[in-house]
């Protein structure tokens, strides 16, 4: 097994390929990509034996923007016999001898064609899990040091990749997709983007400390209030900045102040440090990056989650430019900070970025 399979949003295979090639090279790992447009996954094949496993251990999954999941795989199994699909899969795993495995996930790429296999995947999981347990596998806790999850990626009927991922360096979600329910009282479906961002960027154990009823937030381009809703739900008082109207349900909470102003010109009230800045405005990504940079450098906010709408072409390059700009500006000013970006499931032609400022040198 010396390949990586990376799941992604259909249509973002080239961005995923460019990113894994760059990140692998930074670790001294080289290889080549096999991809099919709109397939929802790519294969990165390493030149050196053992390098795929090294990437799965050392390349921090949270650093990858476009990948939803990262697993080590071997050659594709093709034309699995209908009467016995399990034996060829078990045979591939026997070479690995995954005694430190915790569970099995039988998945597909996130495309309409592949998802037709999901019913089969669910039914197939039970007998496959039983067979793997008979081998003495799937016995470890997913929290055990060095434990792995076993993953099967079915790309079409009878054809799959057999692989694994390290539990401490992968998405915990089936197919790399968090299943979020749209809250009936939320003003717009965009609320799921911020909910997924919080789930992705903020450790669950820290969430109640990072969002409290003593905190203040600003939502630039807030109308009708999908993102404001997520902050208010967590107790934060929000200055909702938008010329448009906010949902009446948010006004009724008493936890927002509507500021009918231009998001690019708004400044926080004097002597008021904003704990959270959020922004989902439709604007050129570099213009948004400069706006966010201004807020952070001026000390107007401590932490921010914002979206960057991507151009039709050179999307990965645009992301690199925007993130490099923000990192350089913050470093120039002597800030200690953490920056993460992710192409979330609920994002479309955009990525979501999180920056937390921890202090100054």
Swiss-Prot record:
GO terms for molecular function: S-adenosylmethionine-dependent methyltransferase activity. Its EC number is 2.1.1.186. GO terms for cellular component: cytoplasm. Gene3D superfamilies: 3.30.2300.20, 3.30.70.2810, Vaccinia Virus protein VP39 (3.40.50.150). Signal peptide: none annotated. Keywords: Cytoplasm, Methyltransferase, rRNA processing, S-adenosyl-L-methionine, Transferase. S-adenosyl-L-methionine binds at residues 190, 223-226, 242, 262, 280. It catalyses: cytidine(2498) in 23S rRNA + S-adenosyl-L-methionine = 2'-O-methylcytidine(2498) in 23S rRNA + S-adenosyl-L-homocysteine + H(+). Pfam families: FtsJ, RlmM_FDX, RLMM_N. GO terms for biological process: methylation; rRNA processing. The active site is at residue 309. InterPro entries: RlmM_FDX, RlmM_THUMP-like, RNA_MeTrfase_FtsJ_dom, rRNA_MeTrfase_M, SAM-dependent_MTases_sf. It is found in: Cytoplasm. Catalyzes the 2'-O-methylation at nucleotide C2498 in 23S rRNA. Belongs to the class I-like SAM-binding methyltransferase superfamily. RNA methyltransferase RlmE family. RlmM subfamily. Monomer. This is Ribosomal RNA large subunit methyltransferase M.
